[in-house]
Amino acid sequence: MINVAEIMKRGAENKKLPPWVNMRHAWMVNDGLRDKDLEYPENVVRIKNLDYKKKLDAERFAAILDSWKMDKQREMLYASSGDASDIDSDSYVSNSLFDLCVPASYMGASDKAYPVIVSVHGGGWFYGDKELYSYYCCHLAQSGFVVVNFNYRLAPQNKYPSAIEDVAYLVKYIDDYARVFGLDMNRFFMLGDSAGAQLTAQYCIAASNQGYRKKLDYFT
């Protein structure tokens, strides 16, 4: 188990930057070493860079599925925008992009209704994005799930409850478009790592409480 002090030594600390930026540097280096030379499963496709705060272009999404039948690429772009913000910048702000990691069988199926897993990434509430958990989510998808891997707003630029709001927005979004995405929301699962585990637990508790559901408009 690598502790925080050991992880910090892996980053190139810059005294001119805030401590949280240096910590982000260190975690990025550590995660890069963790994922070095990992290979993605050959029977899984990533549909990248959908946005859960924008209306889904269902025709564009359908066109992606159709185009896959021609060239069988393992990575399909819904939008070409970048995944991570500039980690050196004080204005580091996460976006609302998400990926679908799907079994290859999903791409050619009609009238599909796949079980779905929402994966909430870790990072101490101030670091990380969907790319850090892409390999992990693709391996989950091998078992026949559609796995949703997404970004959420991070501290310190975004104050509580920004992150948990984004978890709720994401779940509502995939529920709203479940038919388009071919999801069976009766077989819905969530998981999270570290900060993601806390956000997952908080979401599930709040979403199952009628008092919270009446006060907040973003729970499904």
Locate predicted features.
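Short beta-strand element of the alpha/beta-hydrolase
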Residues: D111-G124
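Alpha/beta hydrolase fold serine-hydrolase catalytic domain that processes acyl esters and thioesters
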Residues: N3-K16, K36-D37, K55-D57, Q73-R74, ...
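N-terminal cap/lid segment of alpha/beta-hydrolase-fold proteins
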Residues: N22-K112
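Structural recognition of the beta-strand scaffold that forms the well-ordered cores
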Residues: V116-S119, V147-F150, F189-L191
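Catalytic nucleophile-loop/oxyanion-hole region of alpha/beta-hydrolase
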Residues: G128-Y136, V148-R187
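Primarily recognizes the serine-hydrolase "nucleophile elbow" in alpha/beta-hydrolase
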Residues: Y169-T220
